[in-house]
């Protein structure tokens, strides 16, 4: 993985004595890749790349976005029209969001069709399903943040869906909205979920997902 010139350098030796870089490098480069693996096995990795793009562009927009019902829409317009390359950052965020959902769906189909969910990879499949739910939840919460007509009514419809659940439905609706109706508390909740709760959740389950894949390897052909 590293050239002889690099491994012989004093800087490399200093880090290797403390972090065992060479052992980590050997473990990565010696991992067996089955011969049946093709481009469709890259869909999960592409989904990860889309998430990283989402994280970077979303973080950039938090410097200008204002999560209030009176300023949310105008702050998005400011990002699009006044911030240097703001239109590009937001557009990339939107495009990569759509791409992430698409790649996630294709990845789920690939795993299912190739039997990658079978023993001993049941837990890997379960964490993947959880990641899929979080990904869709990202889309739902992010869709509302511009707080335009589309976002507002999307929130109103989505947050009203749990009302059909017996016994606890009305309580769930009130929890999502932060009250009886859609308003500032609703936007605050969705913003918090989108920028803090879901990123942490997806990072934790991604780590678990990748560690299990690393431990068990790629499933064999059907």
Swiss-Prot record:
A single Pfam family it belongs to is Cytochrome_B
Can you provide one Gene Ontology molecular function annotated for this UniProt record? metal ion binding
Keyword set for this entry? Electron transport, Heme, Iron, Membrane, Metal-binding, Photosynthesis, Thylakoid, Transmembrane, Transmembrane helix, Transport
Q: Where does heme b 1 bind?
A: 107, 209
InterPro entries associated with the record: Cyt_b/b6_N, Cyt_B6_PetB, Cytb/b6-like_sf, Cytochrome_b_N_euk/bac, Di-haem_cyt_TM
Could you tell me what the cofactor note in this record states?
Binds 2 heme b groups non-covalently with two histidine residues as axial ligands. Binds one heme group covalently by a single cysteine link with no axial amino acid ligand. This heme was named heme ci.
Q: Which domain of life is it from?
A: Bacteria
Tell me the residue numbers annotated for binding heme b 2: 93, 194
Q: Which residues bind heme c?
A: 42
Q: Where's it found, cell-wise?
A: Cellular thylakoid membrane
Q: Which residues cross the membrane?
A: 39-59, 97-117, 123-143, 193-213
Q: Which GO terms describe its biological process?
A: photosynthesis; respiratory electron transport chain
Name any cofactors this protein relies on.
heme b; heme c
List the membrane topology term(s).
Multi-pass membrane protein
User: By its UniProt entry, which SUPFAM superfamilies does this protein fall under?
Assistant: Transmembrane di-heme cytochromes
Protein purpose: Component of the cytochrome b6-f complex, which mediates electron transfer between photosystem II (PSII) and photosystem I (PSI), cyclic electron flow around PSI, and state transitions.
Q: To which protein family does this belong?
A: Belongs to the cytochrome b family. PetB subfamily.
Assembly state and interactors? The 4 large subunits of the cytochrome b6-f complex are cytochrome b6, subunit IV (17 kDa polypeptide, PetD), cytochrome f and the Rieske protein, while the 4 small subunits are PetG, PetL, PetM and PetN. The complex functions as a dimer.
Identification of the protein by name: Cytochrome b6
- The organism encoding this protein is Crocosphaera subtropica (strain ATCC 51142 / BH68)
The gene it comes from is petB
